[in-house]
Amino acid sequence: MLKIEVADTFFKRLRGLIGRNNLPQGCGLLIAPCNSIHMFFMKFDIDAVFIDKNFTIKKIVENVKTWTGLAFCFGAWAVVEFSAGEASRLNLVVGQKLEVEINT
């Protein structure tokens, strides 16, 4: 089960992962609502996993680069950001439902 932190307020979504050096394996940040991301001010590359309200994966964008990366998914409700390489390591695929443990 994936451990997920939630960014569901304006300021939490605005900050996202800015200022962090990494995310541990199996951990991610859920930004909701959100269907696009940028990588300005980020310190590490990420995998962006766009999901619907049922946590079904709609799109996976791997290895989004710091400062230059952008990713979006029309129709997505949210995005879960993981450290780069996690989507592959976890064998995530489009259509799969994410099983998550929400950390508050």
Locate the predicted segments by residue:
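Compact, glycine-rich, soluble single-domain proteins
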Residues: M1-T104
